[in-house]
Design a protein with these regions (language model features):
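Interaction-mediating elements
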Residues: 1-126
Length: 126
């Protein structure tokens, strides 16, 4: 059910990109309680300068290595689940890839269940 869009500066290895996807998927399952195998991700690299994130917004010091993670999902997660999700991703990317926690920007987009079709032109959750 969640669809993750991950945007980062180009030049990272396929293994690096895959690891970002793995960390996001694991957090989706463990913190948002999505079922195993519910992995839908689009990972896109951009030329330097095409990802713009204020380097000091909200007092967080970001670098040009910022990663944007946007997850579209069904409505219904608690604030506690969302906070745990953010932390799990930031910590996981830092531990596995040495990506600075400050460079991980996450956005959740909640939609109604009727807004999904996983194939065959059918709204499977409606």
């Amino acid at each position: 059910m969640p669809l993750a869009r991950i945007d980062l500066v180009q030049g990272k290895s396929p293994e690096y990109r895959r690891m970002i996807g793995d960390v996001v998927y694991e957090a989706v399952v463990s913190e948002l309680k999505a079922p195993e195998g519910d992995r839908f991700q689009v990972i896109t690299e951009h030329p330097a300068g095409d990802l713009i994130a204020d380097p000091r917004y909200l007092g967080i010091n970001r670098t040009a290595d910022v990663v944007f993670i946007q997850v579209m999902m069904n409505v219904g997660r608690t604030l506690e689940q969302k906070k745990a999700f953010y932390k799990k991703i930031a910590d996981g990317l830092h531990e596995r890839l040495e990506l600075r926690r400050e460079d991980v920007l996450i956005n959740l987009v909640e939609v109604g269940k009727e807004n999904w079709s996983f194939g065959n032109g059918i709204a499977q959750y409606a």
